[in-house]
Amino acid sequence: MITVKPGSVVFENVRKTFGAFTAIPDLSLTIEPGTLVTLLGPSGCGKTTTLRMLAGLEHPNSGRILIGGKDVTMLPANERDVSMVFQSYALFPHMSALDNVAYGLQSSGLKKAEAREKAEEGLKLVGLAGMGHRLPAELSGGQQQRVAVARALVLEPQVLLLDEPLSNLDARLRRRVRTDIRELQQRIGFTAVYVTHDQDEALAVSDRIIVMKEGEIAQSGAPRELYEAPASSFIADFMGEANVVPCEVVSQTGDESLVRVGTMEHRVRSRGPRSGSAKLAVRPGAITIGAAGGSGMPGRVLHTAYLGGHIEYEVETEVGTLFIIDHEMNHTQRETSDVTLNFKNRGIALIDA
């Protein structure tokens, strides 16, 4: 039986350089046992370097890395209680799915019969029972990915590392496999550190998302928190599309601020004391569009696009051009027509100017 003892992950003031380039200046983070945490960010943000240091494929210049409370900072990869699922899956093409899964077990000293029995259990765990005889070339991309996950899980690691595991799959298959990964993680309860640059992927699978920028943590939190309450324009724009517009904080009562956007006023939740100039991050779906002359912000439609399930608008306003997604589609506004815009209560965040 496969039993996983999830471990915690701690980075304490970790620094990593490559020659004169500082990839990670000073990183501290904690990942609780049994959670799936995604390192998210654009190319070059340091997420892959962080994962490689956790795996033991790179070593920091300073600081400490702990897995399950044990200092592993300078331990080689083969002495760390982690398993990694690579972007390319790294399956042996001449070996069956069963032999691929059993390979690591046999390499660690388990007898062949025991290794194969446990490998069969691993394949069953990921929904591939009865397919162990197939070669990788006889499996779909999603099935190959599940073989790679099974191979990692049968080693019963404290932490499972996933490096862009869905990047080689088409869009429809990515949705299916990310659901499989999330369901498997919740069912077994292993600790997982997941690296991706895909915001939708991160939102779908994560207990917590750590957004990185230039080797530092830009913001960390639950998926909904990062999407609905971004701390900066970088987070707002990176976690899905957002209109970032200037505003003025008129007054504040508790955790709610009254802001003026152009000639329109709107109440929005805020973090801590606010006054003076600021910015609003407004999701495209948080703007309603109606006929001209109503109460709200006046605008003029520049472009429209019908996409089946919604209509997209670009509307020129006194605070700039706003991108709007209308899912209700009660009335289609024509290009060049005058309209009135209003903000919904959700999908709007007050951020620093």
From Swiss-Prot:
Q: What is its EC number?
A: 7.2.2.7
Q: Which reaction does it catalyse?
A: Fe(3+)(out) + ATP + H2O = Fe(3+)(in) + ADP + phosphate + H(+)
Key word Iron present = yes
PROSITE patterns, per the entry: ABC_TRANSPORTER_1, ABC_TRANSPORTER_2, FBPC
ABC transporter domain segment(s): 9-239
Q: Which residues bind ATP per the record?
A: G41, P42, S43, G44, C45, G46, K47, T48
- Signal peptide feature range: none
What keywords are assigned to this protein? ATP-binding, Cell inner membrane, Cell membrane, Ion transport, Iron, Iron transport, Membrane, Nucleotide-binding, Translocase, Transport
UniProt subcellular location: Cell inner membrane
According to its UniProt entry, the function of this protein is described as: Part of the ABC transporter complex FbpABC involved in Fe(3+) ions import. Responsible for energy coupling to the transport system.
Q: How does it assemble?
A: The complex is composed of two ATP-binding proteins (FbpC), two transmembrane proteins (FbpB) and a solute-binding protein (FbpA).
PANTHER family, alphabetically? Answer: SPERMIDINE/PUTRESCINE IMPORT ATP-BINDING PROTEIN POTA (PTHR42781), SPERMIDINE_PUTRESCINE IMPORT ATP-BINDING PROTEIN POTA (PTHR42781:SF4)
Task: Give the protein family.
Answer: Belongs to the ABC transporter superfamily. Fe(3+) ion importer (TC 3.A.1.10) family.
Name the record gives this protein: Fe(3+) ions import ATP-binding protein FbpC
Kindly list the organism's lineage: Bacteria, Pseudomonadati, Pseudomonadota, Alphaproteobacteria, Hyphomicrobiales
What gene does the UniProt entry assign to this protein?
fbpC
